């Protein structure tokens, strides 16, 4: 799988700050994905290993007592139309592939 990332998001994954990747669709199994970093890099620069898939609508119920969490989850669902989050298990930087 090939996933595209903005440079700032790539850096958050690389540093370990970002622990979930949110998307509209994800397979329901752990995956390895090559990371394409968009402009100005425009290259494949890493590999990310994604683990368990979480359904954001389930999180709405799980975190219903935490208004801050519910607000963030709603933003992902309503603004970005994301349905899933996958745990970022591991990151591996590679040589740039242009």
Report each predicted region and the residues it spans.
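Structured alpha/beta reader/binder surfaces that contact nucleic acids or chromatin modification marks
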Residues: 1-98
